[in-house]
């Protein structure tokens, strides 16, 4: 969610909205928790959540993200596509809420993403989710728990071939948690 060039966020929002209107012409963007979505439609809404965030519309991004997450949970689908979207969305919501300084809520969504990942077969994002949890804990002044998570995460990331991510965690650890023991 954090990777964008900042250029055409508004245009991206418009294009994603237009794409969704192709299959859901009468969708009410103020309340779609009761809608049923195909994996493609759900993916468009997940991307729209990210686009709103990148455009600085955090509250809209949170609202849309929470509604699509509710709709996906309500569908009880066994399709792995839906589980992947739920994991991505819960993780994205945790990042947006963290940026808003709403750390308790951010931690709840990060833990939801963690649980969905662990309980399912989709663990590809788990290291990034664990890093997010550690960052949230650091922001909540739970530095020792944050440090322990990061110190365990770095060798694991290197082991599974996520060296760049491990370097990022190491850099964050050195910058934010060096010589900090509370």
PLM features: residue spans?
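Amphipathic alpha-helical segments of tetratricopeptide repeats
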Residues: 17-30, 66-78, 111-122, 152-162
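TPR-repeat structural position
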Residues: 9-10, 58, 103, 143
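Residue register of alpha-helical TPR repeats
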Residues: 36, 43, 81-84, 88, ...
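Structural motif corresponding to the intra-repeat A-B loop/turn of tetratricopeptide repeats
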Residues: 6-7, 55, 100, 133, ...
């Amino acid at each position: 969610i954090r990777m964008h060039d900042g250029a055409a966020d508004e245009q991206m929002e418009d294009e994603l909205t237009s794409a969704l209107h192709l299959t859901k012409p009468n969708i009410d963007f103020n309340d779609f928790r009761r809608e049923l979505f195909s994996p493609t439609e759900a993916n468009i809404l997940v991307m729209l959540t990210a686009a709103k965030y990148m455009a600085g519309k955090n509250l809209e991004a949170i609202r849309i993200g929470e509604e699509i997450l509710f709709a996906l949970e309500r569908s009880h689908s066994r399709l792995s596509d839906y589980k992947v979207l739920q994991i991505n969305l819960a993780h994205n919501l945790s990042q947006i809420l963290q940026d808003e300084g709403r750390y308790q809520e951010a931690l709840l969504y990060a833990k939801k993403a963690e649980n969905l990942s662990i309980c399912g077969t989709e663990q590809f994002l788990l290291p990034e989710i664990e890093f997010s949890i550690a960052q949230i804990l650091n922001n909540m002044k739970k530095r020792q728990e944050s440090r322990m998570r990061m110190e365990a995460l770095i060798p694991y990331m290197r082991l599974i071939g996520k060296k760049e991510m491990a370097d990022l965690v190491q850099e964050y650890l050195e910058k934010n948690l060096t010589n900090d023991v509370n």
